[in-house]
């Protein structure tokens, strides 16, 4: 967006917003170098600094701007009603997928280096070594798809269902019991907001910001641990007493309701335009 903001400043556009989505943790050398080059430019041409969370704000705008409250944090909000847990939808979707009473693990996201997709397969393979009555729903496509499917085939994971891109992610989350997100890096992953709204027990890497930790059944674990250690940790902590029906209320109270955030953003735009255009 740096080029667009430069042009906007050149032609006298009074309100110029730039939104940071990624934190600086482990995002790769090329991206890191690009960000370092663009930071001073963006700080000069941006009138209103936005970010999806505190870590993403510090990464692009710097700690001083965050401490001085110059950065507007706009939560990655969702339509919470769509992800509110429903026992009837769960039963219907599980029947549709041929699932019974087994523990259903799952993930949603691009099959990519960032999402650590092959590692997810390795974790589930280890889970299967300790536990037989289970299945895995892998929702998403991406550049690592062939590699991921080959690895699952190599391990003989016929119970790992690849569902590709779907428009019923909310219902699939209700069919799941456990959600995995061992990403190498993230900004503030909206999929984890959705998973918590659906009341899922979640296991995420320590590269994911704890700003998004809302429900008590969300567990962080280190990327320095191997797949067997992850599998044992998951099995030891997956049986949560958290009532999945409370997921939506928790997410709404934490500020991730789309209607509320959209209204806040609308009000911000109106104030910014009035302040700088009058």
State the predicted function of each range.
Residues 103, 107-126, 143-149:
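A conserved mid-protein helix/loop that constitutes part of the nucleotide-sugar donor-binding site
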Residues 241-278:
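A charged, aromatic-enriched C-terminal amphipathic alpha-helix characteristic of glycosyltransferases
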Residues 2, 11-31, 47-48:
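A short, histidine- and acid-enriched strand-loop-helix "catalytic/donor-clamping" loop
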Residues 165, 184:
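Aromatic "clamp/platform" in nucleotide-sugar-dependent glycosyltransferases that forms part
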Residues 84-98, 240:
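A short helix/loop element that forms part of the nucleotide-sugar donor recognition site in Leloir-type
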Residues 44-88, 220:
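Donor nucleotide-sugar binding/catalytic pocket of nucleotide-sugar-dependent glycosyltransferases
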Residues 201-205, 210:
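Short hydrophobic beta-strand element within catalytic cores of glycosyltransferases
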